[in-house]
Swiss-Prot record:
GO terms for molecular function: rRNA binding; structural constituent of ribosome. PANTHER family: 39S RIBOSOMAL PROTEIN L20 (PTHR10986). Gene3D superfamilies: 6.10.160.10, Ribosomal protein L20. The keyword Membrane does not apply. SUPFAM superfamilies: Ribosomal protein L20 (SSF74731). This is Large ribosomal subunit protein bL20. One of its GO terms (biological process) is translation. Keywords: Ribonucleoprotein, Ribosomal protein, RNA-binding, rRNA-binding.
């Protein structure tokens, strides 16, 4: 039986890693060992930052809602509490969109919150 050395498989594996490392800076897209390390790190960063992105967007929405709420004489927490008392079920993403693109509609919601808070 002939001896199998596995050159084809190794080349295919290395080629796959180097293809994933395409566009990386310096030796990280040329040398197999550094490319492999960087690809592994990239997978880690992608996994971590998919979760981070959710936190970042929520933070952005809250900042936008707070700015619009203060233009209407309320703080963010007062607005959210007032909306809960008024039984208005609008999520933060929708509120932030209203704050940026439809100030009149946001003002209506802020007035409803003020009314329930007794302001």
């Amino acid at each position: 039986m002939a001896r199998v050395k596995g050159g084809v498989v190794s080349r295919k594996r290395r080629k796959r890693v180097l293809k994933l490392a395409k566009g990386y800076y310096g030796a990280k897209h040329i040398l197999f060992r550094t490319a492999k390390e960087q690809v592994m790190n990239s997978y880690y960063y992608a996994y971590r930052d998919r979760r981070q992105r959710k936190r970042d967007f929520r933070k952005l929405w809250i900042t936008r809602i707070n700015a619009a709420a203060r233009m209407n004489g309320l703080s963010y927490s007062q607005l959210m509490h007032g909306l809960k008392l008024a039984e208005v079920e609008v999520n933060r993403k929708m509120l932030a969109d209203l704050a940026v693109n439809d100030a009149a509609a946001f003002t209506v919601l802020a007035d409803a919150a003020k009314e329930k808070l007794g302001k």
